[in-house]
């Protein structure tokens, strides 16, 4: 079966894109646990941590950190969960390594120990726009 993330990266499958550069793409999760739940994907297909170069993991975390800052700056989040589900036993369902950025708000009932509650984003397009604008503001501030 073809990789859905490779299809998204190639523009052959739909996704709400938050961030993109030459090596990475960040998209909103289609089944978010929180509003703004974002996936950071390397454009080069690797399956899991065993075949992903350390530099790629570091880049993914750096991009995840930027998205977390953007979510907090826009009040979409009061904190951040960052995770990689590595392997079937860790609940990895798409076998293209990816980083989850989950921006919870105070009062969200999100607990890894007790299981996660599925929340529907009321307006995924608006959430995507909010995060893209916040990232653009970060870029502009960094250039000043």
UniProtKB/Swiss-Prot annotation:
Gene3D superfamilies assigned to the protein according to its UniProt record, in alphabetical order: HIT-like
InterPro entries, per the entry: HINT (IPR039384), Histidine_triad_CS (IPR019808), Histidine_triad_HIT (IPR001310), HIT-like (IPR011146), HIT-like_sf (IPR036265)
Domain (HIT) ranges: 4-111
Single GO BP term: nucleotide metabolic process
Alphabetical list of CDD domains matching this protein: HINT_subgroup
Pfam families xrefs: HIT
Gene Ontology MF terms in the entry: catalytic activity
Locus of motif Histidine triad motif: 96-100
Name listed for the protein in its UniProt record: Uncharacterized HIT-like protein MT1300
Organism: Mycobacterium tuberculosis (strain CDC 1551 / Oshkosh)
């Amino acid at each position: 079966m073809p990789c859905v993330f490779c299809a998204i990266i190639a523009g052959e499958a739909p996704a709400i894109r938050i961030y993109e550069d030459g090596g990475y793409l960040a998209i909103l999760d289609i089944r978010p646990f929180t509003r703004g739940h974002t996936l950071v994907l390397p454009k080069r297909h690797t399956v899991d941590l065993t075949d992903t170069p350390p530099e790629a993991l570091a880049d993914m975390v750096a991009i995840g950190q930027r998205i977390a800052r953007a979510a907090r700056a826009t009040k979409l989040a009061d904190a951040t969960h960052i995770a990689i589900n590595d392997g079937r036993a860790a609940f990895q369902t798409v076998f293209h390594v990816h980083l989850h950025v989950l921006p919870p708000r105070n009062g969200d009932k999100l607990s890894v120990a007790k299981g996660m509650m599925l929340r529907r984003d009321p307006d995924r397009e608006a959430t995507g726009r909010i995060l893209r604008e916040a990232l653009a503001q970060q870029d502009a501030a960094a250039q000043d």
